[in-house]
Amino acid sequence: MNNHFKCIGIVGHPRHPTALTTHEMLYRWLCDQGYEVIVEQQIAHELQLKNVPTGTLAEIGQQADLAVVVGGDGNMLGAARTLARYDINVIGINRGNLGFLTDLDPDNALQQLSDVLEGRYISEKRFLLEAQVCQQDRQKRISTAINEVVLHPGKVAHMIEFEVYIDETFGFSQRSDGLIISTPTGSTAYSLSAGGPILTPSLDAITLVPMFPHTLSARPLVINSSSTIRLRFSHRRSDLEISCDSQIALPIQEGEDVLIRRCDYHLNLIHPKDYSYFNTLSTKLGWSKKLF
């Protein structure tokens, strides 16, 4: 065992039984290496582990030096929103589909993780968005997002009329099916599908991408991440929502606005030493290879 990490948390809710084998293999291996290991409560229950330290995501964030998320990007997003509040590093073993955020190969995870535990890794900070539903600036409901905050109708698709203010200055009005407000991390997710630009993770920027706008002049907009975005609605409807990372939904009631800004804290995401963002883009998005 080395001094880079002493206490390691294992998190991630598996959707398939095969993913549990990765959790169990990782737990046994870390224990054999002499690390203190905390297992997320649900995982410990499903693995039927007895007499092992367990904890919630918040407890793991408070006690561990490193959290290993086993699963796909959805698992990473769900865990990271909580873990980002604490001084903990996070890395992912991909048991999902694309795996933009979980870049350890499950077939070689132990070797790659061994290198990381010995200090051979790349560290980066990813900022989050904070979304508030408020009335006359009195906060009523709040959540955070690693990828994006999306304004959309609730149950039935329909056109939304709204105004966008940047730092309390009117930016534009729009009639569309919604709006995607994305971080650089989320620029390769829902935002990309809607025609938004890809932003490298180190950029301090936020993108605003319209969803099916009812005018050809509506285009994606990139603003500084220090800006505050306010959404106001011309026709008050009770079926509007904002969703955070497609996992948490906040309803918008009559007379309420939405405020979106960069969080005060960030996610400490680490990668293997040979990680390359552009290699990941090429592999995951099927970009063409070099010509010469």
Curated annotation (Swiss-Prot):
EC nos: 2.7.1.23
GO CC term, one of those recorded: cytoplasm
Taxonomically, which superkingdom?
Answer: Bacteria
Task: Report the InterPro entries cross-referenced here.
Answer: ATP-NAD_kinase_N, ATP-NAD_kinase_PpnK-typ_C, NAD/diacylglycerol_kinase_sf, NADK
Has keyword Nucleotide-binding? yes
**Any idea which GO molecular function terms this record carries?**
ATP binding; metal ion binding; NAD binding; NAD+ kinase activity
Look up the record and name the cofactor or cofactors this protein needs. Answer: a divalent metal cation
Query: What is the organism of origin for this protein?
Result: Salmonella schwarzengrund (strain CVM19633)
Q: Which family does it belong to?
A: Belongs to the NAD kinase family.
Q: By which gene is this protein encoded?
A: nadK
Q: Does the keyword Ion transport apply?
A: no
Could you tell me where this protein is found in the cell? Cytoplasm
| Annotated binding of NAD(+), by residue | D73, G74, N147, E148, H158, R175, D177, T188, A189, Y190, S191, L192, S193, Q247
Question: How is this protein named in the record?
Answer: NAD kinase
Q: Catalysed reaction(s)?
A: NAD(+) + ATP = ADP + NADP(+) + H(+)
Q: What class of enzyme is it?
A: transferase
> According to its UniProt record, what is one Pfam family this protein matches?
NAD_kinase
Write out the catalytic residues in the record.
D73 (proton acceptor)
For this UniProt record, the keywords arranged alphabetically read as follows:
ATP-binding, Cytoplasm, Kinase, NAD, NADP, Nucleotide-binding, Transferase
Q: Name one GO biological process term.
A: NADP biosynthetic process
Chief location category: cytoplasm
| Functional summary from the UniProt entry | Involved in the regulation of the intracellular balance of NAD and NADP, and is a key enzyme in the biosynthesis of NADP. Catalyzes specifically the phosphorylation on 2'-hydroxyl of the adenosine moiety of NAD to yield NADP.
